[in-house]
C-alpha cells in the first residue's frame, strides 16, 4: 500500500511543478522578447516604442509571477523616463529612435491606472510601504487630472488634454479598469472610485452600437447624456475594445455586462471569428482572431481549458500581453 501511495504523491508533485514551470515560462518568454535589460517594454508591433500601458502591464505581470527584480527594473525605468513631476502622472509614449523620445506631454489614463494598480499589488504582496505610497500619490493625481463630472456621470478622460470638447467628451472604454478601480476604492475609501465604477458600467451597457450591439474603441458622450461612436476614429469594435470584456471578466466573471460580447461571438466558429467589426456598417475584418485576441474571446465565452500564456513564435507585444493578462484575470 505504501509504494502506490508514494507514487501517487510523486505524480501529483510532478504535475504541480510542471504547471508552475509552464506558467513561469510564459512570463520568462515575455521578458526575453519585449523587456530590455534596463526595464523598458518594447511594442514590437509599433516600431519598438514604449508606453505607460506596456510598463503597467508588465509591472502587473511581475507582481503576479513574484518577480521583484523585474518589477523594480520596470518601475525604475518608468520613473526615470516617463514621470511628469508637475502632474504626478506619466508621459504616455517613448520613442527610442527620436531625438526627443518624449514629444507628446499628455498622459494616458489607463497606463497611469495600471502603474498605480501594480504598485498597490506590489506593496501588499511584498510588504513594502514605498510602493503603496507611490500608488496612493498616482491615484490622487489621476483623480485631479483625469476624472471629471460630465452629463451627470463620473468619467475618466483618456488623457488630461484634448478629450473634453465642452459639448461632448471622448472616452476610451478599454481604459475602464474596473478591477483596479475597485482596489483603489478599498485602499482609499474614496467614493469617487465607486461612482466611477457604477457610471462606467452603465456607460458600457449603453454603448451597444449598431446591429451588432457592441462598443467602439473610442466613443463620444454628449452633454445630453447620449452616446455615439467617436467620429475621429473608425467605428470599430477592435484592438482597443477587446480589453473591455477582459477587464469586465477580471472585475466580475459572472457579470451580465459580458453578454453582448458573448452573443456576438456566438455567431462565429471559434477559429473563424473576425478580428474586428465595424459597428455601423457591420463590415468585418478579412482576417480572424489569433493569439491574445482569441484568448480574450475564450475567456469571455468560458472556454478556459485551452488557455495558455505561452505566446506563439510570431506573436507581438500586444498579443502576448493579452495572453498573459487573461491568465492574471483568471487568477492563474
Swiss-Prot record:
Active site residues per record: 53, 110
Cleavable signal peptide: 1-23
GO BP terms in the entry: cellulose catabolic process
An example Gene Ontology molecular-function term: cellulase activity
InterPro entries on file: 6-hairpin_glycosidase_sf, 6hp_glycosidase-like_sf, Glyco_hydro_8, Glyco_hydro_8_CS
Recorded catalytic activity of this chain's protein: Endohydrolysis of (1->4)-beta-D-glucosidic linkages in cellulose, lichenin and cereal beta-D-glucans
Record keywords: Carbohydrate metabolism, Cellulose degradation, Glycosidase, Hydrolase, Polysaccharide degradation, Signal
EC number: 3.2.1.4
Domain of life where this protein originates: Bacteria
Family, per entry: Belongs to the glycosyl hydrolase 8 (cellulase D) family.
Function: Represents only 3% of the global cellulase activity.
Listed name of the protein: Minor endoglucanase Y
Organism listed in the record: Dickeya dadantii (strain 3937) (Erwinia chrysanthemi (strain 3937))
Amino acid at each position: 500500500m505504501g509504494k502506490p501511495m508514494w507514487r501517487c504523491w510523486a505524480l501529483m508533485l510532478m504535475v504541480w511543478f510542471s504547471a508552475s514551470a509552464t506558467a513561469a515560462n510564459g512570463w520568462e518568454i515575455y521578458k526575453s522578447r519585449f523587456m530590455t535589460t534596463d526595464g523598458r517594454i518594447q511594442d514590437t508591433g509599433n516600431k519598438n516604442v514604449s508606453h505607460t500601458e506596456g510598463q503597467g502591464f508588465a509591472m502587473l505581470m511581475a507582481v503576479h509571477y513574484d518577480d521583484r527584480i523585474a518589477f523594480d527594473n520596470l518601475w525604475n525605468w518608468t520613473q526615470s523616463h516617463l514621470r511628469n513631476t508637475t502632474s504626478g502622472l506619466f508621459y504616455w509614449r517613448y520613442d527610442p529612435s527620436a531625438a526627443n523620445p518624449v514629444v507628446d506631454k499628455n498622459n494616458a489614463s489607463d497606463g497611469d491606472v495600471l502603474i498605480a494598480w501594480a504598485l498597490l499589488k506590489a506593496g501588499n504582496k511584498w510588504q513594502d510601504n514605498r510602493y503603496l505610497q507611490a500608488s496612493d500619490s498616482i491615484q490622487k493625481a489621476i483623480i485631479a487630472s483625469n476624472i471629471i463630472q460630465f452629463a451627470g456621470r463620473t468619467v475618466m478622460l483618456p488623457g488630461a488634454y484634448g478629450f473634453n470638447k465642452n459639448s461632448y467628451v471622448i472616452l476610451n472604454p478599454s481604459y475602464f479598469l474596473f478591477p483596479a478601480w475597485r482596489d483603489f476604492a478599498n485602499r482609499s475609501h474614496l467614493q469617487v472610485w465607486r461612482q466611477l465604477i457604477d457610471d462606467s458600467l452603465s456607460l458600457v451597457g449603453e454603448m451597444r452600437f449598431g446591429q451588432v450591439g457592441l462598443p467602439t474603441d473610442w466613443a463620444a458622450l454628449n452633454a445630453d447624456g447620449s452616446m455615439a461612436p467617436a467620429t475621429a476614429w473608425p467605428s470599430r469594435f477592435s484592438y482597443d475594445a477587446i480589453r473591455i470584456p477582459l477587464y469586465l471578466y477580471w472585475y466580475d466573471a459572472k457579470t451580465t455586462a459580458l453578454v453582448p460580447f458573448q452573443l456576438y461571438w456566438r455567431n462565429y466558429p471559434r477559429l473563424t471569428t473576425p478580428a474586428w467589426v465595424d459597428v455601423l456598417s457591420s463590415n468585418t475584418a478579412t482576417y480572424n482572431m489569433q493569439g491574445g485576441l482569441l484568448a480574450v474571446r475564450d475567456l469571455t465565452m468560458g472556454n478556459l481549458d485551452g488557455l495558455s500564456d505561452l505566446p506563439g513564435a510570431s506573436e507581438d507585444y500586444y498579443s502576448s500581453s493579452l495572453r498573459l493578462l487573461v491568465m492574471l484575470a483568471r487568477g492563474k
